[in-house]
């Protein structure tokens, strides 16, 4: 898995340079598990979730039916190590990076054109012997479904099904448009087809 750390600046495509003047290696979405094209995101130091989400808008220009862009602000004293994803619909469309203490990680979960399904999945971060599981779900048909989000810290990777339905020890999911607060993680998912998922982890 590729990880790019950029402190005090943000990641861009290979044709540009980051603010501190260091060239960025070109990485395609195929390298990160997606389709063709450049899709580099990473970690911003000392930046909150709102500023981080704005940087995603400045960098990522994906043309997809459904997505949620996510900013995970790590306010704990631990490094959150990227530990994989669990897909229900769609996939990680960008690089999925570790998040040092005091930094904010940014990425995009997307569902490209094709089957009429939403953008839904779980991302996992490991720290010590614990795993932070973050779930978000954006529907395709808003007449039938709503957006939901959840979080859980446990000793294993939690399934989408359990987090979505609040099963096997998971708290009930939080409806989009509302703040959730579970296991030291505060989160907010907007109710939009192109949504924002804000996460503040204090541990």
Swiss-Prot record:
Location relative to the cell: Nematocyst; Secreted; Target cell membrane
Keyword Secreted in record: yes
UniProt KW keywords: Cytolysis, Hemolysis, Membrane, Nematocyst, Secreted, Signal, Target cell membrane, Target membrane, Toxin, Transmembrane
Signal sequence residues: 1-21
Principal location listed in the UniProt entry: other
InterPro entries: Actinoporin_PFT, Anemon_actinoporin-like, Cytolysin/lectin
GO cellular component: extracellular region; nematocyst; other organism cell membrane; pore complex
Tissue specificity as recorded in UniProt: Strongly expressed in the gland and mucous cells in the endoderm.
GO biological process: cytolysis in another organism; monoatomic cation transport; pore complex assembly
Cell attachment site (motif): residue ranges: 175-177
UniProt-recorded Gene Ontology molecular function terms: channel activity; toxin activity
PANTHER family hit by this protein: BRYOPORIN
Domain notes: Composed of a long N-terminal alpha-helix and a core region rich in beta-sheet structures. Before the pore formation, the alpha-helix binds the lipid membrane, partitions into the lipid-water interface and stabilizes the monomeric molecule on the membrane. Finally, it traverses the bilayer, thus forming the transmembrane pore.
Main function: Pore-forming protein that forms hydrophilic pores and causes cytolysis. Compared to equinatoxin-2 (AC P61914), it reveals lower cytolysis activity (5-12-fold difference, tested on erythrocytes), a larger pore size (probably 2-3 nm) and different affinity to membrane lipids (100-fold lower affinity to sphingomyelin). Binds to sulfatides (SFT). Shows cytolytic activity on HeLa cells, with a different potency than its paralogs (from most potent to less potent: HALT-4>HALT-6~HALT-1>HALT-3>HALT-7>HALT-2).
Homology family: Belongs to the actinoporin family. HALT subfamily.
Subunit text: Octamer or nonamer in membranes. Monomer in the soluble state. In vitro, interacts with folate receptor alpha (of target organism).
Name of this chain's protein: Hydra actinoporin-like toxin 2
């Amino acid at each position: 898995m590729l990880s790019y750390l950029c402190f005090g600046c943000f990641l861009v495509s290979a044709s540009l340079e980051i603010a501190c003047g260091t060239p960025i290696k070109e990485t395609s979405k195929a390298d990160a598990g997606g389709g063709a094209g450049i899709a580099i995101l990473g970690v911003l130091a000392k930046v909150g979730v709102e500023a981080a989400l704005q940087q995603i808008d400045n960098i990522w220009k994906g043309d997809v039916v459904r997505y949620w862009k996510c900013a995970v602000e790590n306010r704990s004293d631990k490094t959150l190590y990227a530990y994989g994803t669990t897909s229900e619909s769609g996939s990680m469309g960008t690089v999925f990076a570790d998040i040092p203490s005091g930094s904010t990680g940014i990425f995009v979960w997307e569902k490209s054109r094709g089957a009429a399904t939403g953008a839904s999945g779980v991302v996992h971060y490991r720290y010590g012997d614990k795993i932070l599981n973050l779930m978000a779900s954006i529907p395709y048909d808003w007449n039938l479904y709503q957006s939901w989000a959840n979080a859980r810290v446990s000793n294993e990777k939690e399934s989408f099904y359990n987090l979505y339905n609040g099963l096997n020890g998971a708290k009930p999911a939080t409806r989009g448009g509302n703040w959730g607060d579970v296991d030291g993680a505060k989160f907010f998912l907007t109710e939009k087809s192109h949504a924002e998922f804000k996460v503040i982890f204090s541990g």
